[in-house]
From Swiss-Prot:
Database matches in InterPro entries: ATP-grasp (IPR011761), ATP_grasp_subdomain_1 (IPR013815), IMP_biosynth_PurP (IPR023656), IMP_biosynth_PurP_C (IPR009720), IMP_biosynth_PurP_N (IPR010672), PreATP-grasp_dom_sf (IPR016185)
Pathway given in the UniProt record: Purine metabolism; IMP biosynthesis via de novo pathway; 5-formamido-1-(5-phospho-D-ribosyl)imidazole-4-carboxamide from 5-amino-1-(5-phospho-D-ribosyl)imidazole-4-carboxamide (formate route): step 1/1
Protein name: 5-formaminoimidazole-4-carboxamide-1-(beta)-D-ribofuranosyl 5'-monophosphate synthetase
Keyword Manganese belongs to the record: yes
Record flagged with keyword Hydrolase: no
Taxonomic lineage: Archaea, Nitrososphaerota, Candidatus Cenarchaeales, Candidatus Cenarchaeaceae, Candidatus Cenarchaeum
The gene coding this protein: purP
Length: 341
């Protein structure tokens, strides 16, 4: 029997609990400073201790994973801490499509894929001098909202950028992405595409809680006006969101279009979990500003199954367990090569 492995962060507990529930041996690549915490959980069979996650690429760590016949599950920490070249160089099988993680990290590739999928998107702003409306400025890759800021003009953009550089949050040469800010109800739509069944599943939706931008809503406007600080969008946690049933058909359609576009642009396509992120406007239409081409941390709120998976399965299934079940089925059907890269 193969083993399942991942990095000790993000959603690793959900992933390895799901793998253990499906009968797999589990390995966690764990930073030494967090060893005591992860040893609390009996479903983790082995800790592969490292000083930093960059050691995942080293011969020693790769050998341990290979000796355990392991399949590595990528998540946001992998995308945040490693370059696309590094991810693509991983020697053990990676669940899903490791090549599409480059498209998640690169803003121009990300926009190209979203346009190909016919997703409704906010306007991107080419340069600070073109800012003519409220914008949100983002970093490349999976930064978890850290270093994001809003601006109404080039002057405000430059002032806030300089402040973040001086505080060490962003670097001087960091390539920032400027996007029109679209108001609405934030929704992070979670999907799973099974290449074995050639079918898409809507897993659920969540909202993210960000500090300290959320706390500002509890401060009276006159006090806010007197503040010179830059609010942060650092993600602290997630909460569940159940969509109106009339919106579900559109959510499925977006997921299907995204999978089809992915198969055309970055073979073998969008296999496994992914998330389309955006806002619902007052007309009920969804505007997408991001996608994540792997499991997202928002699935952690459904560790005992989501409301929508309750409609598809007769037992509680987390996204971590759904991934493990796909691997298990692929092994049984001798189709593992269709689920890993």
């Amino acid at each position: 029997m193969k083993s399942v492995s991942t990095l000790g962060s993000h959603c690793s507990l959900q992933l390895l609990k799901g793998a253990k529930d499906e009968g797999f041996r589990t390995l966690l690549v764990c930073e030494r400073r967090r060893e005591r915490f992860y040893r609390r959980f009996g479903f983790i069979d082995e800790l592969v201790l490292v000083d930093g996650f960059g050691e995942l690429l080293g011969d020693e760590c790769q050998s341990v994973l290979a000796e355990n016949d392991s399949i590595l599950i990528p998540h946001g920490t992998l995308v945040a801490q490693m370059s696309p070249d590094q991810i693509e160089s991983i020697g053990v099988p990676v669940f899903g499509n490791k090549w599409i993680l480059r498209w998640e990290s690169d803003r121009s590739l990300k926009e190209r894929l979203m346009r190909e999928a016919r997703l409704r998107m906010p306007r991107s702003i080419d340069s600070p001098g073109d800012i003519d409306t409220l914008v949100i400025v983002k970093r490349q890759g999976a930064a978890g909202g850290k270093g994001y800021f809003m601006a109404n003009s080039e002057e405000e953009y430059e002032s806030k950028r300089l402040s973040l550089i001086e505080s060490g949050v962003i670097s001087t040469d960091e390539d920032l992405y400027i996007q029109e800010y679209v108001p609405g109800v934030l929704a992070y739509l979670q999907f799973f595409y099974s290449p074995l069944k050639a079918d898409i599943e809507f897993f659920g939706a969540d909202q993210r809680h960000e500090s300290d931008i959320e706390g500002l809503a509890r401060i009276p406007a006159p006090v806010q006006m007197g503040s010179s600080g830059i609010p942060s969008f650092n993600v602290i946690g997630n909460s569940p969101l159940v969509l109106r049933e009339s919106l579900l058909e559109g959510a499925y359609r977006m997921g299907e279009d995204f999978v089809e576009a992915s198969s055309r642009l970055v073979a073998p396509g969008m296999n496994g979990p992914f998330c389309i992120e955006g806002v619902y406007g007052d007309d009920g239409r969804f505007t997408s500003f991001e996608f994540s081409a792997r499991i997202v941390a928002g699935t952690n709120i459904y560790m005992n199954g989501s409301p929508y998976y309750g409609l598809l399965f007769d037992e509680p299934i987390s996204m971590g367990r759904r991934i493990a079940r796909e691997i298990k089925s692929a092994i049984a059907e001798e189709r593992l090569d269709e689920t890993v890269t």
